[in-house]
Amino acid sequence: MRGWRQWWAICAMAMLLALAGCASTGKQMSALERAQYTWSAAIRWGDFEGAWNLVDPEYREAHPMSELQFERYKQVQVSHYRDLASSPGESEALREIEIGVINRHTMAERTMRYTEHWRYDAAKQAWWISNGLPDFWAGE
């Protein structure tokens, strides 16, 4: 009888530990979803300076944005922002996006694809986009 109780106690402890691990992973995924929603809202509404605050601080330091570069983003309007595919991981995630971009001066619209690279910073408990703002002028 005593062996049976010990076995149940060990199983109960194992399940509690497993649930605790799931809870932390769940919180991390929930934080990723919130960060991605905040990012996509900033891009959709043309708040590129706000979106810049969600870019990995190491990337921002290595690739600072000038006022002229931010002004260039004011020349476009985002018409749509669609999540095509995503592959979340424990500390990194990828998301393939389709973005509709309208040139405010010519009113010409075009569609582009952009891959978001996300990185989890355990020290700050935050997800950061690690590849900067979308380059609407790639190849121009």
What are the functions of these language-model segments?
Residues 33-34, 48-94, 107:
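Short solvent-exposed beta->alpha transition segments
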Residues 88-140:
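Exposed beta-sheet edge and beta->alpha loop/turn motif
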